[in-house]
Amino acid sequence: MKQRRPTRNSRRAISLLGALMVMPLWAALATAPSTAAHANARRTGERTTWDSVFSAAQAGRGETTYKQLCARCHMETLAGGDEAGELTGSAFMSSWNGQSLADLHERIRSTMPTDTPGVYTAQQVTDVIAYMLRFNGFPPGSIDLTHANDALKGIRFVSFPP
């Protein structure tokens, strides 16, 4: 009996089936760090970026500030460019997952803009963070995010909703 070789379409179908079988596992692994970050925040009494920690008005101010001070390098879409990293998307979200907003605030405040770091006020940075959070799909609340370091330390950046 002559053995038939798999056709190109059958190989594609097998590859697609394999990918579909692996996707749920990949999704579970991708959300595991966020699940742990949520659990840790709840255990320590901290809030997360999903707890409506900024106001819509503050995000609006942050958008204006971002467009004036940041968009030249980070682009209006927050996608980054040749000169600056992205401020949205999976790489950005996973790199900040589990860290405090105080860490993010300090990073921006001490390194931006790259040619004259530290010139932005704490309020400008906080407003821009509120805009970044809104842009990345986090829900606004009714109270502005404070720039007080102790309060920012108590808010964890968590990539995925609980």
Q: Across the structure, where does each feature detected by a protein language model lie?
A:
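The canonical Cys-X-X-Cys-His
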Residues: G62, Y66-T77, V128, M132
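Electrostatic cytochrome c docking/interface patches
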Residues: A37-T65, T116
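Gly/Gly-Pro-rich "capping" loops immediately C-terminal to redox-active cysteine motifs
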Residues: V53-A59, T77-P113
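Bacterial N-terminal signal peptides
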Residues: L17-A28
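Flexible coil segments in periplasmic/lumen-exposed cytochrome c-class electron-transfer proteins
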Residues: R47, P117-P162
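N-terminal secretory signal peptides that target proteins for export/translocation
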Residues: M1-R12
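Cleavable N-terminal signal peptides
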Residues: A30, S34-A37
